[in-house]
Amino acid sequence: MATYELVTRAGVEAEVARQTARFETREKNFGFKPGEHYYSPVTYTWPDFYNGANSKWAKFLEFGNTLGIVILNRSSGDWLSKRPDIDFATQGSMALSAGARRVSFYIKTRHGAMFEGMPVSYRDKIATNLNVDLSAITPFTEDFIIESARAVKNDYPNIPVNIFLDETNPWIEMSLQDKIIEAYVRLYNRLKRELGNDCLIIINPGSNTPASMMAACDVVLSYESNAAKYLDPGTQWIHPEHYKGFPSWRFWHVIHGATPENIDEVFAKADSLGIGHLYVTDRTFKVGGGSEDEPEENPYDKPPSAWVENRVKAWIGGTLPFEKRLSALEAKIKELEAKRNV
């Protein structure tokens, strides 16, 4: 007599993750190593190499060969109106010369709202969620994304092409989730055929994903929010169990709003989760009276403060635990000296 087992969605996701990790088909790790730390900043700032010592990009590139991924973002992913843009060609080449392992080109996807088979109601929902007009949604079809990717490959021959796909959240409309993930896997395969298997494809849902969406990317930016939420014990599913079978270099966390009081805890949390790529900044995000495209407070319009960069260097170099003890000792000495002088 046949027996049947009731399998939950969570159980299915866990099994998908186990099998996918076991039969990993990627032949290379794109220059990254499991367990290593990579500083992968969100470099949405315009190329400004001509500003010399005041260049924002120069601050990022000071990290040299500890840089993992940097992002070239021309007007929120507009690669078709000016071909090529010499400023971006120059800045990308400078990033490679500085030691960045991968330079990626930013392209919006608007959460797949214009992908094949998506209903009009989903497009409307995305426009509402992003607080933008529908005209800011409709251009972003799968074919438009492929055309944009093809353009950067042709126009920037001195920069090996890698693609950063923004706005890829699969949780916005649960009734369409499987269809959305299927569309992103299809897009991933199309990009690989168009650009080659050496092209690193990053997706940015800004949150965790079902295990099945790991087939739609090489690296997933699976957390993009503030430090307080990152450290809150009540925040669940930052790095769910179904991610555990994948190497650390496939995950990227972006944490804004860090403070001197919590930044070391942020690094410790990332290490406990096994996150390879990290960007931490003290700058803050607030939509306010703006939109997702043009927020009132933008954490990516400037590099982090110098004190953040110093802590990042300690995290990369593996000296952060020692520096934490040293800082605590210095604070204790100051406290004792203050008492002695009373």
Where is each model-derived feature located?
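Glycan-processing catalytic domains of CAZymes
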Residues: 8-321
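Sec-dependent, cleavable N-terminal signal peptides
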Residues: 1-2
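Helical coiled-coil/dimerization "stalks"
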Residues: 331-342
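Alpha-helical coiled-coil heptad-register detector
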Residues: 321-324, 328, 335
